[in-house]
């Protein structure tokens, strides 16, 4: 067994900026690597969130830009779509900027699951109300259809979130 000196490599020098090896090309981590999860936007969960946000935005724009007389029904639809869009964007940013590592007091998979359960139920109700009150106006019908599409995408997120939560919990219990 040898207790001799070994080579220790670090990404930053302990001396000045012009210390030993300052001119050499050393592989270093980018400053955004710790802050941003650059692989997250390519995951299925992120693409699903983007699809949800796009369909919710289209549904909101369709209803907002068309003429309607039943203010309570479509105001409810607008509020639900925008609130759902904002919450999905918030969860997207939490995963993109890795806020879940900083805010460990929150169970992020559980909070995302609860958000999707409540948001999907409210979105389904809003889409049904919007479809029943559309009066054959094309913008309102399109908004209701995109609302149902967003509901389907949110159901897919519930399944994915539930699957991740249960698999994570069951493997933790087995260990």
UniProtKB/Swiss-Prot annotation:
Residue ranges constituting the MARVEL domain according to the UniProt record: 40-166
Tissue expression pattern: Highly expressed in leukocytes.
GO molecular function, one term: cytokine activity
Name assigned to this protein: CKLF-like MARVEL transmembrane domain-containing protein 7
Main location: membrane
Membrane topology of this protein: Multi-pass membrane protein
Pfam families given in the database record: MARVEL (PF01284)
Transmembrane regions: 43-63, 77-97, 110-130, 140-160
